[in-house]
Amino acid sequence: MYAVIKTGGKQYKVAKGDSVFVEKLEVKPGDEVTFDEVILVNDGKSTKIGTPVVEGAKVVAKVEKQGKEKKVVTFKYKPKKHSHTKYGHRQPYTKVTIESIEA
């Protein structure tokens, strides 16, 4: 059984026991979070596709940790002008483990 959920403006294909890195959620590690925006559910026999979401479906997950991804460095320069700028960015994430899919 798997489902497609939408969170943080992105879509993720998840199954029970999967660990997924999603955009940062304001929850503490160890808490449970419920994803109500389920776009698709497949139980092996049939597939339910939502319009836009599947009614009554939800995915329950446990928050494992909060963190930041590796640093992405951007370097801008203008040739012959002695002008350069270096930027760094670390995107925050939340790691969740899928506990159940209810359809």
Swiss-Prot record:
The keyword Transferase does not apply. The keyword DNA-binding does not apply. Transmembrane segments: none annotated. Pfam families: Ribosomal_L21p. InterPro entries: bL21-like (IPR028909), bL21-like_sf (IPR036164), Ribosomal_bL21 (IPR001787), Ribosomal_bL21_CS (IPR018258). Keywords: Ribonucleoprotein, Ribosomal protein, RNA-binding, rRNA-binding. One of its GO terms (cellular component) is ribosome. GO terms for molecular function: rRNA binding; structural constituent of ribosome. Belongs to the bacterial ribosomal protein bL21 family. Part of the 50S ribosomal subunit. Contacts protein L20. This is Large ribosomal subunit protein bL21. It comes from Lactobacillus johnsonii (strain CNCM I-12250 / La1 / NCC 533). The lineage of its organism: Bacteria, Bacillati, Bacillota, Bacilli, Lactobacillales. The gene is rplU.
